[in-house]
Curated annotation (Swiss-Prot):
Coiled-coil parts of chain: none
Compositionally biased region (Acidic residues): 235-251
Keyword Kinase: no
Gene3D superfamilies cross-referenced by the UniProt entry: Glucose-6-phosphate isomerase like protein, domain 1, Helix hairpin bin
Gene Ontology terms: biological process: translation
Annotated protein name in UniProt: Small ribosomal subunit protein uS2
GO molecular function annotations of the record: structural constituent of ribosome
InterPro entries: Ribosomal_uS2, Ribosomal_uS2_bac/mit/plastid, Ribosomal_uS2_CS, Ribosomal_uS2_flav_dom_sf
HAMAP family: Ribosomal_uS2_B
UniProt keyword annotation of Ribosomal protein present: yes
Region (Disordered): 232-251
Family of the protein in this entry: Belongs to the universal ribosomal protein uS2 family.
Top-level taxon of the source organism: Bacteria
Length: 251
């Protein structure tokens, strides 16, 4: 199991919270103290809670569920997109469209439109249009790609969300709650931890902190997917062996 160490958390600055005047009292159990007007997060609790979140995400992937990585603030965009892609999962790192989960059927129509536009440009169908029309189609494609590119292959709502900065992603979290989708989130000292199923207390502003925690969650997905593949392979081998024995008995 690829866990996270206290050293890694310290080096990435995961322990630095927000200014003491900008805090949510509900985060008090996760705060170690304050230094120079900044809250310091209790990393011992972060390590313990991270393990719980890691195990949950790994189990989701092992059972074949998809994880949607969400982080639209500038500091999170690259890590969310790159790490979700690395573990073959989906992501939203630009703008959360209202109804992305609760009205997924309508969102899927836009995804299908994006796929059709991609196909038109890939197979040359777009050449049948005028230059002006082709330019309009390309603008439409780029706009859809920006907001929906990370969920292009997502055929149904995800099994869980991994979120950076729940305060910034309230719409996504509210939609997940309505549908009973569990939420794993990196929760800073200014956030409300109550709606989060798996709280990871930590700095949600520093790029290094975001990258570290997001990459570890991607590792959890990969570990779960690998275990799932091994299970499926074992099952196939057992079925093949059983069929072989059956044929021998019949002979």
């Amino acid at each position: 199991m690829s866990s996270v160490t206290m050293k890694e958390l310290l080096e990435a600055g995961v322990h630095f919270g927000h200014q003491t005047k900008r805090w949510n009292p509900k985060m008090k159990p996760y705060i170690f103290g304050a230094r120079n007007g900044i809250y310091i997060i209790d990393l011992q609790k972060t390590v313990r809670l991270f393990k719980n979140a890691y195990s949950f995400v790994r189990e989701c992937a092992q059972s074949g569920e998809t994880i949607l990585f969400v982080g639209t603030k500038k500091q999170a965009q690259d890590a969310i997109g790159e790490e979700a892609s690395r573990c073959n999962m989906y992501y939203v790192n630009q703008r959360w469209l209202g109804g992305m989960l609760t009205n997924f059927a309508t969102v899927k129509q836009s995804i299908d439109r994006l796929k059709r536009l991609d196909a038109m440009f890939a197979d040359g169908t777009v050449e049948a249009y005028t230059k002006k029309e082709a330019l309009q189609l390309e603008k439409e494609r780029q706009k859809l790609e920006k907001t929906l590119g990370g969920i292009k292959g997502m055929g149904k709502v995800p099994g869980a969300l991994f979120v950076i900065d729940p305060k910034n992603e309230t719409i996504a979290i509210n939609e997940a709650k309505k549908l009973g989708i569990p939420v794993v989130a990196v929760v800073d000292t200014n956030c409300d931890p109550d709606p989060i199923d798996y709280v990871i207390p930590g700095n949600d502003d520093a790029i290094r902190a975001i990258r570290l925690l997001t990459s570890k969650m991607a590792d959890a997905v990969l570990e779960g997917a690998q275990a799932r593949d091994a299970q499926l392979q074992t099952g196939e081998e057992e079925m093949a062996a059983a069929e072989g024995e059956s044929e021998q008995v019949e002979a």
